[in-house]
Every structure is written in C-alpha cells, then in structure tokens.
C-alpha cells in the first residue's frame, strides 16, 4: 500500500507533526482583488515578523452555502488571476477548495494546495483527480467521519500516486447545528502517516444555525486552537477577516485580523512546549 509523506513541503513551507506549526489563513471567500491583496498583505507582514510559515487560503466558489441566495465568491477564472498575482507579490503558496473533478485541472497550474471540502471527502473521483494533478492535497475530515476512517480517504490519494497529503480536523457533528472537537482525533490521524492540520474556525461553526446561513462561536477559536497545539499538529487553519460581522460568509467564526498576531504568539508558545522546540 502506498504511504503518505510524514513531512510535506510546499515551496518554503513545511508541514510536519514534529516541526513548528505552519499556518493556513485567509478570508473564507475571495471577495474582490483589492480585498484579497489587503488581507494577504496583513497576513504576510504578521507571519514574517513572527517567523511563521504561511499558506494563503481563499475560496473562489462557496458551493455548499446554506441558502441559494448566499454569496459564493468571484468565480474560478477571476480567482486564478488574483492567486497568480498574489504569489508574485508575496511569494507564499496558495490554497483553494475544489468541488468537481474538472476544477482540479483548472486550478492546478496556479494553486499549490487543492483542498477537498469535508462534505466531499469520500468522493473517490474527486480525490483521484486532485491527486493526479501532483499538487499537495488537503483533505478536510467529514463532520460525519471517525478519525480512523480517514485511512481509506488518504489511501485513495496516495494509491493514485500522490504521497503529499494533509489531513485536517474541523469538528464532528454533535446534535443539530453543532460541532464538537475531539482532540483524540489529532494523534489518531497522525498515526495514519500524514501531517495533521487543525481547523480552528470551522470547528466553532454552527452549521445552518442562522436558518439561511451558518452561525459560529468565534470566542472559542483560541480555546480549541490552544488545545490542538498542545496535543501537537503540523498546521493550523484559521479564517480571518478585517470585519467578520459583515463578511459575506462564515463571519461568525472568523477571527478579526487585528487580533491574529496576539493569538498566534500564544499558540507559538504552546507549540514550543508541546514539541520541545
């Protein structure tokens, strides 16, 4: 059976369960070119000062919004142009999620990490298509999935010839409109061989909690992120925005960007202790 790489390198960014955590961060969706550059510049500046490896994330299409009327993003073609320019300007790798097999080939020339949404983590054809691009694949563990069941998910990618895969914990369904984070899932998934990422913002999401959109409890992002880092992870996934309360999607669980530096400093301290760095 093909195995995953325990250390995944993306440009100058390294994901390893025994190394300092890398950060995947950015707004939920790509709103405009100007907004993307503003957010990217802020994140690049703070992570450079703190010495944290950054992968910038944003979604060109939020295809699984609660309501048909909800905003979804600027679309694939425009987003690829922006991602290419962001990489030239700031030099970091970029990540976006894909929802169909056709999108894999379309984004791979520009995007460094293809992300499989949690709802789609068992879609075999999508996993194979993402794997065959040769890009790093980040798989969100489904809210309905046990951590040990990620073994089969990851093997669909590695057995398609791609050992560079990340496994991301983003909470598990706990009754209606609620998620809970079981920190046991982090070492369990690490035992499967891949670097493990903890999604601190979607883990506090309340799916469909606002009727026509999802709610969230951003006040618990730091609590869960500290717990995850204390257990030990290769990376943290944190969505952020300059004005979360007025963001077009996932505002209730995004971290205000001006609060990110203090949060990251605390998490770095926990990371050093947990890993003996």
Curated annotation (Swiss-Prot):
GO molecular function: 3-deoxy-8-phosphooctulonate synthase activity
InterPro entries linked to this entry: Aldolase_TIM, DAHP1/KDSA, KDO8P_synthase
Gene Ontology cellular-component terms listed: cytoplasm
Parts of the chain that traverse the membrane: none
Chemical reaction(s) catalysed: D-arabinose 5-phosphate + phosphoenolpyruvate + H2O = 3-deoxy-alpha-D-manno-2-octulosonate-8-phosphate + phosphate
Pfam family, any one: DAHP_synth_1
Superkingdom in the source lineage: Bacteria
Enzyme Commission number: 2.5.1.55
UniProt entry keywords in alphabetical sequence: Cytoplasm, Lipopolysaccharide biosynthesis, Transferase
GO biological process annotation, one example: keto-3-deoxy-D-manno-octulosonic acid biosynthetic process
Pathway note: Carbohydrate biosynthesis; 3-deoxy-D-manno-octulosonate biosynthesis; 3-deoxy-D-manno-octulosonate from D-ribulose 5-phosphate: step 2/3; Bacterial outer membrane biogenesis; lipopolysaccharide biosynthesis
Annotated localization: Cytoplasm
Family indicated by similarity: Belongs to the KdsA family.
NCBIfam families, per database record: KDO8P_synth, PRK05198.1
Protein name (record): 2-dehydro-3-deoxyphosphooctonate aldolase
Protein source organism: Brucella anthropi (strain ATCC 49188 / DSM 6882 / CCUG 24695 / JCM 21032 / LMG 3331 / NBRC 15819 / NCTC 12168 / Alc 37)
Gene: kdsA
